[in-house]
């Protein structure tokens, strides 16, 4: 028997659908909150990766909790070592290293899947962080340690291809680095523009979001804000 769907039209549609925030925007915003003062993110979806991000924030010493549909994050990170098992479960966990480097000068995490450094697509992240003064090594199988002995500084960085994750990592690192960072070959996805808008709301200075070249003037201290992340365009479609 043929499987088919028959849609009978002729009736006007009405009503409204609430679109949750996009997970791919929320995760870097949660990482960015470690750089800022008190942050409230509106209408955050209750997903497993969001719960893992909460655990990473708490593991770093930040206060993070739900208030209804909103996520509240406050307090600067105190611990440079991210919970290993949680970090392994989420590919975006590498994003949380950049704020730790910027604030504490050190970040330690398990790589997603517990793989060796060369086995995961984070080479663009690491190459850019090196240009900003970071040094990395493996403390054991799948365990990555990053340090910035003299602090992170601005740099001119060109990505080999427009990686969204690497662009987010380097924007996070540059937002509180010393000096100005110019990032060429950057990803142009809406989530990048959303991250820049959030950081600028928190008194960062980022220009060019949405284009392939970003200019980021580092600010040592960022304020907090209330922010509504980008709606999930996949859900909306």
What does each model-identified segment do?
Residues 1-237:
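Structural preference for solvent-exposed beta-strand-turn elements
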